[in-house]
């Protein structure tokens, strides 16, 4: 496995590759969710590249950039064990300049939900991914459904910038108890992990209601809020697969999303129906 730390090294590696390339962009602190993305990438491509870059432009002032979990040695070992072809681990000063052009996510997709709480976050996501896609030139990119809004915005960029890339949505990976895997779960103690389970349990309740033919989002939201107590709920949202707000559940074209705080840790989860 090649360990690449500069854009020049990545360019050189990519220039020598003629096979189909798959790419898994991450911020490191790799867990079983990331591993599932990498395994699918390896199954569907001849060359697999993984990036582990904690991108500063997608963090707001006061967020956890400095505290964000990092374990470079473990990330490298995981990728080696999975027989990844190259891991890209750049530094921020290698990746950004002061006077570079900016990319803005469309407000219709980025000013709501995560973007309402974290204004500018998705601009930073697109900024880094545009660079990474240009460097890695992948045929396939793999991203988790857990970040459903991000997935939609990235697909919008790929489509509108005429990038010849397939953005593949991968299923959410959960602990045995249902907790969605996240690098930020490391912030939670055992008591907080029990509270965090309220997110997935509220979504399971929503699914059970839909399975019983309930489509009224007000009924579903009320049931979810009851389960989420006493957490501070940021939002519960109901959208279609294009991230347009919906007034009732349409099975096969609906996503229910939830964001809530467990103490100071903000967690997100969703279910695709």
Curated annotation (Swiss-Prot):
Family per similarity comment: Belongs to the pantothenate synthetase family.
GO-annotated cellular components: cytosol
Positions bound to (R)-pantoate: 58, 150
Keywords: ATP-binding, Cytoplasm, Ligase, Nucleotide-binding, Pantothenate biosynthesis
Reactions the enzyme catalyzes: (R)-pantoate + beta-alanine + ATP = (R)-pantothenate + AMP + diphosphate + H(+)
Chain positions recorded as beta-alanine binding sites: 58
GO biological process: one example: pantothenate biosynthetic process
Pathway given in the UniProt record: Cofactor biosynthesis; (R)-pantothenate biosynthesis; (R)-pantothenate from (R)-pantoate and beta-alanine: step 1/1
Molecular function as annotated in GO: ATP binding; pantoate-beta-alanine ligase activity
EC number assigned by the record: 6.3.2.1
Primary location recorded for the protein, binned into one broad class: cytoplasm
Protein localization: Cytoplasm
Function: Catalyzes the condensation of pantoate with beta-alanine in an ATP-dependent reaction via a pantoyl-adenylate intermediate.
Miscellaneous comment: The reaction proceeds by a bi uni uni bi ping pong mechanism.
Subunit composition and interactions: Homodimer.
Top-rank taxon: Bacteria
Annotated InterPro entries: Pantoate_ligase, Pantoate_ligase_C, Rossmann-like_a/b/a_fold
Catalytic residues identified in the record: 34 (proton donor)
Classification of source organism: Bacteria, Pseudomonadati, Campylobacterota, Epsilonproteobacteria, Campylobacterales
Keyword Transmembrane helix among UniProt keywords: no
Positions with a binding annotation for ATP: 27-34, 144-147, 173, 181-184
Protein name (database record): Pantothenate synthetase
Residues that span the membrane, as ranges: none
Organism for this UniProt entry: Campylobacter hominis (strain ATCC BAA-381 / DSM 21671 / CCUG 45161 / LMG 19568 / NCTC 13146 / CH001A)
């Amino acid at each position: 496995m090649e360990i690449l730390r500069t854009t020049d090294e990545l360019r050189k590696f990519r220039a020598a590759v003629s096979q189909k390339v798959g790419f898994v962009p991450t911020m490191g602190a790799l867990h079983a969710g990331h591993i599932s993305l990498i395994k699918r990438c390896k199954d569907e491509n001849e060359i697999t590249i993984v990036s582990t870059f904690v991108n500063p432009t997608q963090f707001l002032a006061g967020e956890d950039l400095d505290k964000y979990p990092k374990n470079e040695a473990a990330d490298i070992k995981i990728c080696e064990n999975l027989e990844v072809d190259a891991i890209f681990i750049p530094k921020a000063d290698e990746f950004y300049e002061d006077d570079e052009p900016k990319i803005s996510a469309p407000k219709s997709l980025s000013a709501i939900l995560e973007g309402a709480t974290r204004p500018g976050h998705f601009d930073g996501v697109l900024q880094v991914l545009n660079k990474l896609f240009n460097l890695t030139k992948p045929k396939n990119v793999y991203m988790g459904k857990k970040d459903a809004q991000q997935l939609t915005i990235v697909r919008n960029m790929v489509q509108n910038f005429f990038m010849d890339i397939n953005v593949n949505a991968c299923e959410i990976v959960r602990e045995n108890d249902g907790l969605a895997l996240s690098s930020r779960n490391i912030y939670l103690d055992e008591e907080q992990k029990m509270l965090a389970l309220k997110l997935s349990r509220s979504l399971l309740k929503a699914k059970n209601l839909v399975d019983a033919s309930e489509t009224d989002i007000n009924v579903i939201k009320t049931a979810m809020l009851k389960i989420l107590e006493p957490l501070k709920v940021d939002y519960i949202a109901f959208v279609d697969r294009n991230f347009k707000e919906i007034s009732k559940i349409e099975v096969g074209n609906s996503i229910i999303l939830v964001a809530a705080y467990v103490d100071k840790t903000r967690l997100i989860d969703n279910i695709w129906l």
